[in-house]
Amino acid sequence: MKAILYIMLLIFVSCGGNNNSNFEKNRNEQTQKITNTVKTINELKIDLRKSMIDYIKTGDAEYGEKDVNECFFIIDNFLIDVKNSKSKKDGLSIVKNTVLQLNNINKKTNFSLIETMERENIAEIINLAGYEKGYNAKDEDITEQWREW
């Protein structure tokens, strides 16, 4: 009887250790996913700003640094708001509002601020932030239905 009890105790401790190990592994994977997403968003923002500023320097841009700063103000507010959102419905409302604001600034610059590369970067920033919150699939474009860029 003691042997059976000892074996059961040993199995219980062994299984408990595996669950903790699996829990810890899953937690580490989730933390890494968030860290990688944030890093990617920051890298995309750096590339986006560089592209916009570099085009101003060519002298062909129909927008200025003030417009670039306004664009980034919109994007940064989006990232804060979506991070603090509590539901998918709220998150998608934030996406819609952000895209409409970006449409307006792009229209104000004669549709020159957000070109192909900028469009890709902005959409990816928004989509990754939504994905991080679980509002969309990683390859789903949640901006498409509202954007004019």
Task: Report each predicted region and the residues it spans.
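Sec-dependent signal peptide recognition
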Residues: 1-7
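C-terminal motif of bacterial Sec signal peptides marking the signal peptidase cleavage site
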Residues: 13-14
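Signal peptide cleavage region of secreted peptide precursors
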Residues: 17-21
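Short terminal alpha-helical segments
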Residues: 24-81
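Amphipathic alpha-helical binding modules
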Residues: 24-37, 109-149
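Charged, low-complexity interaction regions
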Residues: 60-63, 86-88, 113
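Mature extracytoplasmic domains of secretory-pathway proteins
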Residues: 72-108
